Amino acid sequence: MGSLVFRRPFCHLSTYSLIWGMAAVALSTAQVEVVTQDERKALHTTASLRCSLKTSQEPLIVTWQKKKAVSPENMVTYSKTHGVVIQPAYKDRINVTELGLWNSSITFWNTTLEDEGCYMCLFNTFGSQKVSGTACLTLYVQPIVHLHYNYFEDHLNITCSATARPAPAISWKGTGTGIENSTESHFHSNGTTSVTSILRVKDPKTQVGKEVICQVLYLGNVIDYKQSLDKGFWFSVPLLLSIVSLVILLVLISILLYWKRHRNQERGESSQGMQRMK
């Protein structure tokens, strides 16, 4: 006599509870989000950082901190109870310019090198839950570029220098053979870097009338600075030296002739005076 076998799906309540619990936690975590945006501003200008909390729970207090190597440093807090509270080290430097518990903004009135870095905004909600976001501030200084050239007896120097923050890079376009290139960098106390590149042309006559291009790479952009080498400048230097030498020679000859003539006149007058006395 055969036996009947009944199969039914296995269902364990603890397993389903665990799955649903994990899903609920993931869903609640996904609903809490802090939206931030990094900023890049010019040095010694006004800069603002903003945080937005995306949750239905009402925050109790918003705290801004600066990230440091050892531990974050408290800067300012805002709450409905106490309003804006700025730490002594940041007074007259920053303020909360957007007063809100879901949206908060801090503003640096005159950015300095110390203000560059990353900042955390912490939202304390009911139940002592803390949610944070990070926004970074980067400061820059636009490039100041100088391009010029100098002729020497046996070579030509073409110099291109750029000062900026962060450090720029220099390259050349339109150069030929027989040219040496040297580049050096100098760091300044104001956070900028000067990069100087010098082209040394062994035969200057080959570059007269041509155009050289100094290319400055800065923050992903390349800017061309053009310089045309004066066509007549190289030949005018020897000519000018010859003219100056000739003029000096003529002046010396004129002085010598005048001196001799004046001396002869004095001798003649002296002889006539002696004859009259006799």
From Swiss-Prot:
The keyword Electron transport does not apply. GO terms for cellular component: cell surface; plasma membrane; postsynaptic density; presynaptic active zone. Disulfide bonds join 51-121, 118-136, 160-214. Residues 31-141 form the Ig-like V-type domain. Changing residue 37 to K: No effect on binding to CD200R. Glycans are attached at residues 95, 103, 110, 157, 181, 190. Keywords: Cell membrane, Disulfide bond, Glycoprotein, Immunoglobulin domain, Membrane, Signal, Transmembrane, Transmembrane helix. The chain crosses the membrane at residues 233-259. GO terms for biological process: negative regulation of cell population proliferation; negative regulation of macrophage activation; negative regulation of neuroinflammatory response; regulation of immune response. Gene3D superfamilies: Immunoglobulins (2.60.40.10). Residues 31-232 are extracellular. InterPro entries: CD200_Ig_V_dom, Ig-like_dom, Ig-like_dom_sf, Ig-like_fold, Ig_sub, Ig_V-set, Immunoglobulin_dom, OX2G-like. Residues 260-278 are cytoplasmic. Changing residue 57 to K: Enhances binding to CD200R. GO terms for molecular function: cell-cell adhesion mediator activity. Residues 1-30 form the signal peptide. Pfam families: ig. PROSITE patterns: IG_LIKE (PS50835). It comes from the Eukaryota. It is found in: Cell membrane. It is a single-pass type I membrane protein. CD200 and CD200R1 interact via their respective N-terminal Ig-like domains. Costimulates T-cell proliferation. May regulate myeloid cell activity in a variety of tissues. This is OX-2 membrane glycoprotein. It comes from Mus musculus.
